[in-house]
Amino acid sequence: MNIEVGTTIKGTVVKVADYGAIVRLPGGKTGLVHISEIADAYVRDVRDYLNEQDEVTVKVLRLNDRGRYELSVKQG
């Protein structure tokens, strides 16, 4: 599946860390939701909002120079 910047798609949280969450996208690709892109409010602990295996809707913000997707839940 071709994932384009600006699209909104569903994914599954596969890892939660202090800095954000890794989300598996369709086609087996993964992307990062940085802690600042989880909610409009201040996020002290990512686990208050996201947990592994959660289904989330994310917006694809960009594909960085390393070929990694940067995602947003709050814009999704």
Language model: regions and residue ranges:
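Single-stranded RNA-binding regions, centering on S1/OB-family and related RNA-binding modules
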Residues: 1-76
